[in-house]
Amino acid sequence: MKELSIASSEFHTVEELQEYIKIGLHFPDYYGENLSALYDCLTQSADPIILEFDVDGFFDDTMKQYFKKVGKVCEDAVEENELLEFSVILPKEEGW
């Protein structure tokens, strides 16, 4: 089983986040570090995966929007792969 917890405030760039996901979930070297590649790896995984997003702040609006896109990809992947679990810990403030 692969487990990965992602705290939104720890990432300043898309590249940092994608690299963290790649390493944390042991994705192959050919992982494209983009949303399409993320979806492909999540839906094709034969290993159980648990992903948890802790939305605890953002470096900037670009990262906030990207986290929303990653969350949508994960939600879509859950529908295709029963071995995938995805949860989000939302902040108390509005706007997510």
Give the positions of each predicted feature.
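Positively charged, polar, low-complexity stretches
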Residues: 1-96
